[in-house]
């Protein structure tokens, strides 16, 4: 698509990218033809519509649009119509129907029209042609005394007129014309060669124009008529042609046609003499007449032939209709239908050669045509069909063409011009022929009866062909390239060979070109053509006359002016020169016979001469022609490609300009409309948009909820439930649609009311303005009036004063002057009153006119505004309605598609789940069989061991018996000594093994004592810490006033640090967990104290507490990860069980309670899935915060160590480095940090160290502490979220061990808050032993009680009850183990199986254990070499719930395992 698409709502308005260079394939054309209702096999004549329609561009008012589902449709922005198919398809369907109707009606009445036209045109044509010829050839006066002899010419049989030797008629008739006016055939052939070149250039112009795509604007009536004629005339060309010629020859009346054709006969008196006239030196002016006439014919033909390709030159063509009529009218004479001179032997050969050349040229010409548009292809195909059909029907169509100039313009012009030339030949001869002509024509017209005449015609045809080929090489380069395609129409059909000779037609076609080519060929003809002296003289005269005619003819070559030039002025003098030589009364029968004999002799001589020259140069000319044709074909290809490329560029540029202009206009129009409407309808638009969005969102939500419900219940409901659901959806959609319609109507009503109110306000404001304007005008006029009156009064007073002064000076004249002045004053007052009255009337009239004008303008503005608002309202209503209906339809389609896809997906998933379930069941069965076989093997091995033990006891008893009887049986000592040694070896081996076991036990006991001593040391340290805490509490009480001064913003920034911490809260629980929580709580309170005092003492405590909290948070996250994994496993098992129940519920009878229970189960499962997703995101965030906090702690510690590095080495002796890890979950061991040290020792050592350290930089520590506060706050919120996502009520395991959980004080800091959840979840996770743990245990450590495993089962059963409120039939009813059904094994069953086989440690467990020990050894070495790492291990976890191993390094740096 071109340009950026425009979005209207959720619809995308696209632009069509029209490709001018696209050429559809034939298969695409056939498919499109079938789409618009064309049968390509039965209706090939309508295929041009398919070729045109498949590449037709989209109309301007139509635009392609795309909805949100991706479907493309077409929308008419003019009338609001939309459709799925291309708008041009319907248009071309109607065109197909119209064309089919035209073809059917024209085919039905064509035969009737032919007969009627023949009779009607006999009466119509003579007066028309006489008028036309009289107007164009007025100076020509021909006597009409030869009408009686012409009447006898009609009596000749039709075979003489339509035979292949019918040309002899013209030659024999011409032999006695105009008192022996004869000329050489070579001269006539030269002229024919010239006309051939002229016709070629005409065809070139026509082809080029059709290729440029200008043929799209041709006259449709003419094209339809030519198509009909070509279709109906192509079935039986030979038979129709013979019959039409016979009919024309038998029915024509020469008396009527002679009156109209005699001016044309004088005009073309030399045209037929070119073919068969002997040399007559006494008449040199006839060649000039012939050339001028041929040029006139060419010009007329150019003017008429350019119409199919250039409709814009119709005005030039209309300006000269008389020329066309003059050239067309003589075609009505049927006697000269085919005046070609060739024999039966030579004509087929030349026709084949010309046909080959024409086919090659046609192929070359068709290649670029295929690249043009479909309109150009249709026009070119139509023109080719017209040429062929008219060539077969030229005698038949001559009457209609002569009588109807409009049909003449629509048809091809080359054939009509040739017919006119032949008819003119016979018409010219008709006045000079009598009965002798008739007698001479009858034997010459029948080719089977007169062999001698056929031989003469053969010689004549050879001569004509020889001269043609001799004269064709010097043709101009353009004319040689253009003439073969033009003559192809006559050479293409072999059935016309016997009737019309193609070479003569080529020669006559070539006579229709411009005068420039004619003069050039005349000069070349003088140089190359070997002809008698008379012919040369005539050629020179003809060349001179052609040069005189040159300017007029060159004007005709120009495509813009070729019709406007009249050919009659150069023709008239030549025709006048022939007037006194054609009186038919002076000719006698003897003269005619003498002329015939002379003509026969001259013809024989010329034929022999031409045969010899033809045989010599035929091969050379053919080679030259082939070479030139190839060159011209290449040149034509290049020219046509260039023209096509330039046309494409112009069309593309025009399209782009038009698109840009349309976009600009549309944008201007839209911007104008927006600017006009925005001010008045912004609020309403927002309200409507909000309502629409709300309704659409509500509709979408309802649809989504319905889709989810359908997805959930798709597999458990049958067709009846689906139909019911569809009905409910339709009802809801109808209700929503009604609601939308109501909302839309409401919005429109509001908009209408607002517009009415605005209109009233505008009217009121306009009236107020008008009234104000009137008042202002009145006041201004009154003010002016008052000023005028006051000025007049002042003038009067001044005049009175002057008069009084004069009266005082001149007492004698006072009375007289007073009378005069009083009279003048009265006149002045009267004049002033009249002037004021007129002025007042004018002002009032002007006021009234202005008021009327303003009222009219106001009414116009109101009407215009009312119309604009109404149009805008209608437009918005239509847009909203269309948008809503389109949205509803789109949602319905999307809903149906989504339903179908969901149905298919559910079906596929169900199949996959069933297949997986079958595979899992098969695997579980295999595992059960494997376990059974392993159990059997173990039992067998145990039985074997018992048997071996029994045999060992018996052997020992036997050995004792042998020792008692040693003295008695000394002779057997040697035999039994060996047995005794073997027994002793076995005994020693057993003793050694027992000793090793004792040593291991002693080592474990020693380790236990060490650990107890460490515990005592830790208790002592805890007491010391308690004392230190009391001192710190005293200091905290002293600094209470500082804590009260902390601002509200700091409290909000760190809400989890609260200063009111009491030591009694820390003393409520004992043990290691108590120590952790106390230290962490104290670290939080000490951090608050540090923020005020910034003492290094508090910083070390802050660092210690944060380290403990960090490790606790890590452990909590690890426990949460394990819990989440278990919940995920249980969720997967529950989902599998739910799917199984759903499938069983569908297979069994429908029961709504069961379906409702399954729906509740599904909701619970979805809720659990959401909770797990939230837990994942929260844990991810917690991990990130832990990393940040650890980095900050490391930075703080490194800064502290840098401050203390210059104080000397660390005081105190570190205790032994050790690592303690929990074996309850070996899978997540690698992800945990094994750096756990003893915080009390570390804090005590740091306390001892801190006393001697100087104060730190407050700014750096304050920044790090502030970042730690923020991270701790975020981490607390994340851990609280994780705590809230877990089950609220702890499992029974937590109730059985209350002493081990620290109390949670609501006033304590949030850091211990997640310690409680940590303890709860650590206890929960530690209650689930795995096979790896039992492999480590190997029976030495304390066993977990059965209540622990039972607690895990209870917890999982509680989960199952939450997922399945209706009950768990698998757990309550099925006696099979849980592993076979739910995909996991219960803790009790794991304990039972693992205790049974604890002696056999798997290889994988040992390998994992060895790898872990090796990694821990390397880590211990790294810790030993790093002095900055913490020195003490963390306190052990409660022994009642955890089975712990401790790794340590002995004096040889080897790892030793201590279990406790």
Curated annotation (Swiss-Prot):
Cellular localisation: Cytoplasm, Cytoskeleton, Microtubule organizing center, Centrosome, Centriole; Nucleus
Chain positions with Phosphoserine modification: 186, 201, 566, 1386, 1388, 1443
InterPro entries in alphabetical order: MT-Golgi_org_protein (IPR051841), WW_dom (IPR001202), WW_dom_sf (IPR036020)
Biased composition (Low complexity): 285-296, 453-464, 514-525
Signal peptide: none
UniProt region (Disordered), positions on chain: 107-135, 213-412, 440-593, 658-719, 1290-1310
Compositionally biased region (Basic and acidic residues): 256-270, 310-323, 357-367, 465-481, 537-546, 658-668, 686-719
Tissue expression from the record: Expressed in several cell lines.
Composition bias, Acidic residues: 217-227
Keywords linked to the UniProt accession: Cell cycle, Cell division, Ciliopathy, Cilium biogenesis/degradation, Coiled coil, Cytoplasm, Cytoskeleton, Disease variant, DNA damage, DNA repair, Mitosis, Nephronophthisis, Nucleus, Phosphoprotein
Example of a GO biological process term: DNA repair
GO cellular component, as recorded: centriole; centrosome; ciliary transition fiber; cytosol; extracellular space; intracellular membrane-bounded organelle; nucleoplasm
Result after altering residue 186 to A: Prevents phosphorylation
Entry protein name: Centrosomal protein of 164 kDa
Lineage of origin: Eukaryota, Metazoa, Chordata, Craniata, Vertebrata
Gene this chain is encoded by: CEP164
């Amino acid at each position: 698509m071109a340009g950026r698409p425009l979005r209207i709502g959720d619809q995308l308005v696209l632009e069509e990218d029209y490709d001018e260079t696209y050429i559809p394939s034939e298969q695409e054309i056939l498919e499109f033809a079938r789409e618009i209702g064309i049968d390509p096999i039965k209706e090939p004549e309508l295929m041009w519509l398919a070729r045109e329609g498949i590449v037709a561009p989209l109309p301007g008012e139509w635009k392609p649009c795309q909805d949100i589902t991706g479907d493309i449709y077409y929308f008419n922005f003019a009338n609001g119509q939309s459709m799925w198919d291309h708008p041009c398809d319907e248009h071309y369907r109607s065109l197909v129907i119209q064309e089919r109707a035209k073809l059917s009606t024209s085919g039905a009445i064509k035969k009737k029209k032919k007969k009627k036209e023949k009779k009607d045109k006999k009466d119509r044509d003579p007066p028309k042609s006489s008028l036309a010829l009289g107007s164009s050839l007025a100076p020509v006066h021909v006597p009409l005394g030869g009408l009686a002899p012409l009447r006898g010419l009609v009596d000749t049989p039709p075979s003489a007129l339509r035979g292949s030797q019918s040309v002899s008629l013209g030659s024999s008739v011409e032999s006695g014309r105009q008192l022996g006016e004869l000329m050489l055939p070579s001269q006539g052939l030269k002229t024919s060669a010239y006309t051939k070149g002229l016709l070629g250039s005409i065809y070139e112009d026509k082809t080029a124009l059709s290729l440029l795509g200008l043929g799209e604007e041709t006259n449709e009536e003419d094209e339809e008529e030519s198509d009909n004629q070509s279709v109906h005339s192509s079935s039986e060309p030979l038979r129709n042609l013979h019959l039409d010629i016979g009919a024309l020859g038998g029915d024509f009346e020469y008396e009527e046609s002679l009156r109209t054709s005699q001016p044309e006969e004088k005009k073309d008196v030399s045209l037929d003499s070119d073919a068969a006239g002997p040399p007559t030196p006494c008449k040199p002016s006839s060649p000039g007449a012939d050339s001028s006439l041929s040029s006139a014919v060419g010009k007329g033909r150019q003017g008429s032939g350019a119409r199919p390709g250039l409709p814009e030159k119709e005005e030039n063509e209309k300006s000269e209709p008389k020329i066309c009529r003059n050239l067309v009218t003589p075609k009505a004479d049927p006697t000269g239908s085919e005046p070609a001179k060739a024999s039966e032997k030579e004509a087929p050969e030349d026709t084949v050669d010309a046909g080959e050349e024409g086919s090659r040229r046609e192929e070359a010409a068709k290649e670029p045509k295929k690249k043009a548009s479909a309109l150009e292809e249709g026009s070119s195909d139509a023109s080719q069909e017209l040429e062929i059909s008219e060539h077969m029907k030229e005698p038949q169509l001559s009457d209609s063409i002569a009588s109807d100039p409009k049909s003449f313009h629509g048809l091809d012009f080359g054939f009509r011009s040739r017919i006119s030339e032949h008819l003119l030949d016979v018409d010219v001869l008709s006045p000079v022929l009598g009965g002798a002509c008739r007698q001479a024509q009858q034997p010459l017209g029948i080719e089977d009866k007169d062999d001698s005449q056929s031989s003469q015609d053969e010689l004549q045809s050879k001569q004509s062909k020889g001269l043609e080929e001799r004269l064709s090489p010097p043709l101009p380069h353009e004319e040689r390239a253009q003439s073969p395609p033009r003559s192809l129409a006559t050479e293409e059909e072999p059935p016309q060979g016997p009737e019309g000779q193609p070479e003569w037609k080529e020669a006559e076609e070539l006579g229709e070109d411009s005068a420039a080519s004619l003069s050039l060929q005349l000069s070349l003809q003088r140089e190359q053509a070997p002809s008698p002296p008379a012919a040369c003289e005539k050629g020179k005269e003809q060349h001179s006359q052609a040069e005189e005619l040159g300017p007029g003819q060159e004007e005709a070559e120009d495509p813009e002016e070729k019709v406007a030039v009249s050919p009659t002025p150069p023709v008239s003098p030549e025709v006048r020169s022939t007037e006194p030589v054609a009186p038919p009364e002076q000719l006698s029968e003897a003269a005619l016979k003498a002329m015939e004999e002379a003509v026969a002799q001259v013809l024989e001589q010329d034929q022999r001469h031409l045969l010899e020259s033809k045989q010599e140069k035929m091969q050379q000319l053919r080679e030259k022609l082939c070479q030139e044709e190839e060159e011209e074909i290449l040149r034509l290809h290049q020219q046509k490609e260039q023209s096509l490329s330039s046309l494409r560029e112009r069309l593309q540029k025009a399209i782009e300009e038009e698109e840009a202009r349309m976009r600009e206009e549309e944008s201007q129009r839209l911007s104008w409309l927006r600017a006009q409407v925005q001010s008045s309808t912004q609020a309403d638009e927002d309200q409507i948009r909000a309502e629409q969005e709300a309704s659409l969102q509500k509709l979408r939500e309802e649809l989504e909820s319905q889709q989810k419900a359908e997805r959930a219940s798709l597999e458990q409901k049958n067709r009846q439930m689906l139909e019911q659901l569809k009905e409910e959806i339709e009802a809801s959609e109808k209700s929503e649609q009604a609601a939308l319609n109501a909302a839309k109507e409401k919005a429109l009503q509001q908009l209408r009311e607002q517009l009415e109110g605005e209109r009233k306000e505008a009217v009121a404001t306009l009236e107020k303005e008008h009234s104000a304007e009137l008042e202002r005008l009145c006041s201004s006029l009154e003010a002016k009036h008052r000023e005028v009156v006051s000025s007049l009064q002042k003038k009067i007073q001044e005049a009175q004063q002057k008069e009084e002064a004069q009266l005082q000076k001149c007492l004698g004249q006072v009375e007289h002057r007073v009378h005069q002045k009083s009279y003048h004053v009265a006149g002045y007052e009267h004049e002033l009153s009249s002037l004021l009255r007129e002025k007042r009337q004018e002002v009032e009239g002007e006021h009234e006119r202005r008021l009327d004008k303003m009222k009219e303008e106001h009414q116009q503005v109101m009407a215009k505004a009312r119309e604009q608002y109404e149009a805008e309202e209608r437009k918005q209503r239509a847009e909203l309605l269309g948008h809503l209906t389109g949205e509803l339809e789109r949602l319905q389609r999307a809903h149906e598609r989504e339903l179908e896809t969901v149905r298919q997906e559910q079906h596929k998933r169900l199949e996959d789940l069933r297949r997986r379930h079958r595979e899992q069941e098969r695997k579980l069965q295999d595992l059960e069989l494997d376990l059974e076989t392993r159990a059997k093997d173990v039992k067998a091995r145990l039985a074997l061991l018992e048997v071996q033990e029994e045999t060992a006891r018996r052997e020992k008893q036997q050995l004792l018996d042998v020792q008692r009887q040693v003295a008695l049986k000394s002779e057997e000592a040697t035999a039994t000594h060996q047995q005794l040694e073997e027994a002793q070896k076995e005994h020693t081996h057993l003793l050694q093994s027992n000793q090793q076991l004792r040593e291991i036990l002693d080592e474990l006991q020693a380790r236990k004592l060490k650990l107890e001593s460490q515990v005592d040391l830790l208790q002592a340290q805890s007491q010391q810490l308690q004392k230190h805490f009391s001192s710190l509490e005293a200091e905290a009480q002293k600094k209470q006033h500082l804590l009260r001064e902390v601002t509200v913003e700091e409290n909000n920034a760190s809400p989890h640090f609260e200063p009111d911490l009491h030591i009694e809260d820390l003393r409520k629980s004992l043990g290691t967990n108590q120590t952790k929580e106390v230290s962490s709580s104290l670290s939080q309170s000490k951090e608050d104290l540090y923020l005020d005092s910034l003492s290094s003492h508090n910083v070390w405590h802050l660092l210690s507490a944060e380290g403990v909290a960090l490790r606790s948070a890590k452990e909590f996250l690890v426990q949460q990860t394990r819990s989440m994994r278990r919940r995920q496993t249980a969720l997967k098992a529950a989902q599998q069980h739910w799917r199984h129940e759903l499938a069983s519920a569908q297979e069994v009878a429908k029961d709504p309670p069961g379906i409702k229970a399954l729906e509740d189960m599904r909701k619970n499962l979805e809720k659990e899935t959401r909770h797990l997703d939230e837990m994942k995101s929260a844990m991810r965030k917690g991990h990130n915060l832990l990393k940040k906090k650890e980095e900050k702690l490391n930075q703080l510690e490194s800064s502290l160590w840098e401050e203390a590095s210059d104080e000397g080495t660390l005081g105190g002796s570190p205790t032994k480095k050790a690592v303690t890890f929990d074996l309850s979950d070996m899978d997540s061991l690698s992800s945990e940090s094994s750096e756990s040290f003893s915080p009390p020792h570390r804090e005590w050592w740091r306390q001892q160290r801190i006393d001697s350290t100087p104060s730190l930089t407050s700014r750096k520590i304050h920044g790090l502490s502030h970042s730690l506060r923020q991270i701790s706050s975020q981490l607390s919120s994340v851990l609280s979220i994780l705590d809230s996502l877990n089950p609220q009520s702890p499992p029974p395991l937590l109730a059985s061990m209350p002493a081990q959980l620290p109390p949670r004080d609501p006033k304590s800091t949030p850091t211990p808050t997640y310690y409680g959840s940590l303890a709860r979840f650590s206890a929960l996770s530690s209650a689930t032993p795995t096979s790896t743990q039992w492999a480590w245990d190997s029976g030495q450590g304390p066993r977990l009680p059965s209540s622990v495993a039972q607690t895990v089962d209870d917890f999982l059963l509680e989960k199952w009850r939450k997922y399945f409120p209706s009950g768990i039939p698998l757990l309550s009813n099925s006696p099979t183990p849980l592993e076979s059904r739910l995909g996991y094994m219960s803790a009790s069953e794991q304990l039972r199986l693992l205790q049974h086989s604890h002696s056999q440690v798997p290889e994988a467990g040992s390998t994992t254990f060895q790898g872990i020990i090796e990694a821990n050894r390397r880590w211990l070495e790294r810790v030993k070499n790093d002095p900055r790492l913490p020195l003490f291990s963390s306190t052990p976890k409660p022994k009642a719930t955890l089975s712990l191993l401790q790794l340590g390094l002995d004096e040889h740096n080897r790892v030793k395992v201590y279990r406790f």
